[in-house]
């Protein structure tokens, strides 16, 4: 049995290709006035009423019979219990994935440094981890334990003192895999709250929920809107759009493999985007046939079909160099280089969240256990953004120590520049430190 999908076909030789591509890529999630106002009301309530507001919203939105905030707190012992409630195979997979993620992120750690100039002046940079990070995890059956690993482990590697996780438990439904992942990743505290109210609690603190320095993790439109509103009070990772995959293929990979790689992102939601670029028109036809053949075998076929038909595309290009140009124009979240010699083409890629090299490297491996982070820039923001990493949980302070001679010498320069800006106090502050014998020079 096969189905007939209506995936878009584009050709880079078409005079209107750029316009068609822009239309394909266009996606904007704008919170409407009602969502914005509701989120602002929730934030205000949490700031004013703290724990009581959290309990009330959790009862209302999640259907949880919580009498007090104590009913919404999971201690470390509960996380350890979750490890015993998952299968040995699941635990082994989580621990292996966590170990690989940890090893990779250890290489990202930045260290402080200093250097000393001839006159004894010392300049440098001090790298310090954040004190506390907040991790938002979606709840219910759609929970992703892999996201817990990807968000929490870099924070712990960075040296963050405390990682606080919030995860809703709709109708009391607890995902043991998520709690087990939190235990393995080193999460310190868990609160079973979600939505905008959880974001507000992390940003401003309540009697029980500690205020954090940065909030990371995905969520629905209410969570994303709340993160926008609290940014500045705390740091945030990003406002993520729908998941994306762009596959560049020379036409020599099994078309079933490519179709399934496209499905792997399309199954996330109807707005996800899956695009294949190839110079081989016949190969595009074979992949289209594989899509139709494999679609009925998918558990989430309805979602995949809507995604493929609504935002997917098969794009024919002149050659592999033009394929690179198209890839850089799209700046995808996930980029597969399913080609014979991916290393040869890697220097041509400037904009991508993660690059999967070669025919055997499916994007799914990066999602779960390869090691690099799966929290990636979407919606073209890979042009200026990077994957989540240890550096997102570290901050840098400049170090300046001037010797007497150094302060005297730099004082002349600072004085000239400060007076040029009519900032007399700046100038005089520097001038006071000029050595007496140099003041007349």
UniProtKB/Swiss-Prot annotation:
<dbReference type="InterPro" id="IPR012131">
    <property type="entry name" value="Hstdl_DH"/>
</dbReference>
<keyword id="KW-0479">Metal-binding</keyword>
<dbReference type="GO" id="GO:0051287">
    <property type="term" value="F:NAD binding"/>
</dbReference>
<keyword id="KW-0520">NAD</keyword>
<keyword id="KW-0028">Amino-acid biosynthesis</keyword>
<feature type="binding site">
    <location>
        <position position="421"/>
    </location>
    <ligand>
        <name>substrate</name>
    </ligand>
</feature>
<feature type="binding site">
    <location>
        <position position="136"/>
    </location>
    <ligand>
        <name>NAD(+)</name>
    </ligand>
</feature>
<feature type="binding site">
    <location>
        <position position="220"/>
    </location>
    <ligand>
        <name>NAD(+)</name>
    </ligand>
</feature>
<keyword id="KW-0368">Histidine biosynthesis</keyword>
<feature type="binding site">
    <location>
        <position position="265"/>
    </location>
    <ligand>
        <name>Zn(2+)</name>
    </ligand>
</feature>
<dbReference type="InterPro" id="IPR016161">
    <property type="entry name" value="Ald_DH/histidinol_DH"/>
</dbReference>
<dbReference type="GO" id="GO:0005829">
    <property type="term" value="C:cytosol"/>
</dbReference>
<dbReference type="InterPro" id="IPR022695">
    <property type="entry name" value="Histidinol_DH_monofunct"/>
</dbReference>
<comment type="similarity">
    <text>Belongs to the histidinol dehydrogenase family.</text>
</comment>
<feature type="binding site">
    <location>
        <position position="265"/>
    </location>
    <ligand>
        <name>substrate</name>
    </ligand>
</feature>
<feature type="active site" description="Proton acceptor">
    <location>
        <position position="333"/>
    </location>
</feature>
<protein>
    <recommendedName>
        <fullName>Histidinol dehydrogenase</fullName>
        <ecNumber>1.1.1.23</ecNumber>
    </recommendedName>
</protein>
<feature type="binding site">
    <location>
        <position position="334"/>
    </location>
    <ligand>
        <name>substrate</name>
    </ligand>
</feature>
<keyword id="KW-0862">Zinc</keyword>
<dbReference type="InterPro" id="IPR001692">
    <property type="entry name" value="Histidinol_DH_CS"/>
</dbReference>
<feature type="binding site">
    <location>
        <position position="426"/>
    </location>
    <ligand>
        <name>Zn(2+)</name>
    </ligand>
</feature>
<feature type="active site" description="Proton acceptor">
    <location>
        <position position="334"/>
    </location>
</feature>
<dbReference type="Pfam" id="PF00815">
    <property type="entry name" value="Histidinol_dh"/>
</dbReference>
<keyword id="KW-0560">Oxidoreductase</keyword>
<feature type="binding site">
    <location>
        <position position="197"/>
    </location>
    <ligand>
        <name>NAD(+)</name>
    </ligand>
</feature>
<dbReference type="GO" id="GO:0004399">
    <property type="term" value="F:histidinol dehydrogenase activity"/>
</dbReference>
<feature type="binding site">
    <location>
        <position position="367"/>
    </location>
    <ligand>
        <name>substrate</name>
    </ligand>
</feature>
<comment type="function">
    <text>Catalyzes the sequential NAD-dependent oxidations of L-histidinol to L-histidinaldehyde and then to L-histidine.</text>
</comment>
<dbReference type="GO" id="GO:0008270">
    <property type="term" value="F:zinc ion binding"/>
</dbReference>
<feature type="binding site">
    <location>
        <position position="268"/>
    </location>
    <ligand>
        <name>substrate</name>
    </ligand>
</feature>
<feature type="binding site">
    <location>
        <position position="367"/>
    </location>
    <ligand>
        <name>Zn(2+)</name>
    </ligand>
</feature>
<comment type="pathway">
    <text>Amino-acid biosynthesis; L-histidine biosynthesis; L-histidine from 5-phospho-alpha-D-ribose 1-diphosphate: step 9/9.</text>
</comment>
<dbReference type="GO" id="GO:0000105">
    <property type="term" value="P:L-histidine biosynthetic process"/>
</dbReference>
<feature type="binding site">
    <location>
        <position position="243"/>
    </location>
    <ligand>
        <name>substrate</name>
    </ligand>
</feature>
<feature type="binding site">
    <location>
        <position position="426"/>
    </location>
    <ligand>
        <name>substrate</name>
    </ligand>
</feature>
<feature type="binding site">
    <location>
        <position position="268"/>
    </location>
    <ligand>
        <name>Zn(2+)</name>
    </ligand>
</feature>
């Amino acid at each position: 049995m096969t189905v007939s999908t209506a995936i878009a076909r584009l050709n880079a030789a078409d005079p209107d290709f750029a316009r068609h591509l822009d239309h394909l890529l266009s996606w904007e999630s704008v919170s409407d006035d009602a969502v914005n106002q509701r989120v602002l009301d929730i934030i205000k309530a949490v700031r004013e009423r703290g724990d009581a507001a959290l309990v009330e919203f959790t009862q209302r939105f999640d259907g949880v019979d919580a009498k007090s905030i104590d009913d919404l707190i999971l201690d470390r012992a509960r996380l350890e219990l979750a490890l015993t409630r998952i299968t040995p195979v699941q635990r082994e997979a989580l621990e292996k994935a966590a170990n690989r993620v940890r090893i990779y992120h250890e290489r990202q750690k930045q260290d402080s440094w200093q250097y000393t100039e001839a006159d004894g002046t010392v300049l440098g940079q001090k790298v310090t981890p954040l004190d506390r990070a907040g991790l938002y995890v979606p709840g219910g059956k759609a929970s992703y334990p892999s996201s817990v690993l990807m968000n929490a482990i870099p924070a712990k590697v960075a040296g963050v003192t405390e990682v606080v996780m919030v995860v809703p438990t709709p109708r009391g439904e607890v995902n043991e895999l998520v709690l087990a992942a939190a235990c393995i990743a080193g999460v310190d505290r868990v609160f079973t709250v979600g939505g905008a109210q959880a974001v507000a609690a992390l940003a401003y603190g309540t009697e029980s929920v500690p205020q954090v320095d940065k909030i990371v993790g995905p969520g629905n439109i209410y969570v994303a809107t709340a993160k926008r509103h609290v940014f500045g009070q705390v740091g945030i990772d990003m406002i993520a759009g729908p998941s994306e995959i762009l596959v560049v293929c020379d036409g020599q990979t099994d078309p079933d493999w490519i179709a399934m790689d496209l499905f792997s992102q399309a199954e996330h939601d109807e707005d996800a985007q899956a695009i294949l670029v190839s110079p081989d028109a016949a190969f595009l036809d074979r992949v289209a046939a594989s899509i139709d053949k494999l679609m009925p075998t998918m558990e989430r076929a309805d979602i995949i079909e809507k995604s493929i038909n609504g935002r997917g595309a098969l794009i024919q290009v002149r050659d592999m160099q033009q394929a690179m140009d198209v890839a850089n124009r799209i700046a995808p979240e996930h980029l597969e280089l399913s080609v014979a010699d991916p290393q040869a083409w890697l220097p041509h890629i400037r904009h991508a969240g993660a690059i999967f090299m070669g025919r055997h490297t499916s994007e799914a491996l990066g999602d779960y256990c390869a090691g690099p982070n799966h929290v990636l820039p979407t919606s073209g923001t890979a042009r200026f953004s990077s994957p989540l990493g240890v550096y997102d949980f570290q901050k840098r302070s400049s170090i300046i120590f001037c010797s007497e001679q150094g302060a005297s010498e730099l004082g002349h320069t600072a004085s000239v520049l400060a007076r040029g800006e009519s900032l007399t106090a700046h100038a005089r502050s520097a001038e006071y430190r000029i050595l007496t014998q140099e003041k007349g020079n």
